[in-house]
């Protein structure tokens, strides 16, 4: 994936921080994928490293994120696409706060500096989701989705956005250089929201 990405993680104290890595591990094992990664909702990608150099933390802290915006991640359902990074994921509702954050962050990507372009992208292209599987295989069929739904339920994750295990409020925005191999994807800056 070219450039860097901004990911939204659950707040440090949220129970999903310990549950979601287990679900990703079980899902990856079930489908024979070697890829493991930090549970996250991608806010935007394709940020040029020159944008946040030489001080990624200072750059992340400089983003004008309003503390008044309620940023909520609400799980909706399991889904699969024939795309490596969206092979199997939890689709999330495009809440107003999440959409506003996506617009603000997308403006940091070359070609989206104007509010209008970033807002169009957030409305037409942004698909908030939490990946459970990166894999080079066909999209997951209905029986595979049903198996992972049972796994999710056994961990307590609520795929319908209900209860505290159906998403989270706020969280941590992290900057990750995603132009490296997946096993090297680690945050280089973090900001509490």
Curated annotation (Swiss-Prot):
Broad class of the protein's primary localization: Golgi
Per the UniProt entry, the Enzyme Commission number(s) are 3.1.4.37
The family database entries (Pfam families) matched by this protein are listed as: CPDase
The active site is formed by: 40 (proton donor/acceptor), 129 (proton donor/acceptor)
Q: Name one GO biological process term.
A: cyclic nucleotide metabolic process
Superkingdom as given in the UniProt entry: Eukaryota
InterPro entries for this protein: Cyclic-nucl_3Pdiesterase, Cyclic_Pdiesterase
Q: Report the GO terms under cellular component.
A: Golgi apparatus
Where in or outside the cell?
Golgi apparatus
UniProt family annotation: Belongs to the 2H phosphoesterase superfamily. CPD1 family.
In UniProt terms, what function does this protein have?
Answer: Involved in the metabolism of ADP-ribose 1',2'-cyclic phosphate which is produced as a consequence of tRNA splicing.
Instruction: Quote the protein name from its UniProt record.
Output: 2',3'-cyclic-nucleotide 3'-phosphodiesterase
Which organism encodes this protein? Phaeosphaeria nodorum (strain SN15 / ATCC MYA-4574 / FGSC 10173)
Lineage from the top down? Eukaryota, Fungi, Dikarya, Ascomycota, Pezizomycotina
Gene (UniProt): CPD1
């Amino acid at each position: 994936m070219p450039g860097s990405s901004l990911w939204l993680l659950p707040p440090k104290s949220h129970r999903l921080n310990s549950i979601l890595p287990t679900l990703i591990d079980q899902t990856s094992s079930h489908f024979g994928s070697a890829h493991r990664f930090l549970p996250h909702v991608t806010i935007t990608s394709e940020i040029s490293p020159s944008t946040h150099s030489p001080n990624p933390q200072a750059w992340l802290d400089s983003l004008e994120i309003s503390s008044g915006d309620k940023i909520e991640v609400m799980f909706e359902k399991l889904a699969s696409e024939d795309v490596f990074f969206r092979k199997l994921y939890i689709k999330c509702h495009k809440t107003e706060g999440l959409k506003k954050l996506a617009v603000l962050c997308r403006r940091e990507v070359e070609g989206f500096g104007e509010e209008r372009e970033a807002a169009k992208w957030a409305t037409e292209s942004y698909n908030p989701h939490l990946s459970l599987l990166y894999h080079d295989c066909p999209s997951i069929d209905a029986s595979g989705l049903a198996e992972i739904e049972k796994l999710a339920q056994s961990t307590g994750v609520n795929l319908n956005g209900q209860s505290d295990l159906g998403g989270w409020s706020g969280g941590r925005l992290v900057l990750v250089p995603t132009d490296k191999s997946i096993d090297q994807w680690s945050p280089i800056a973090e900001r509490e929201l």
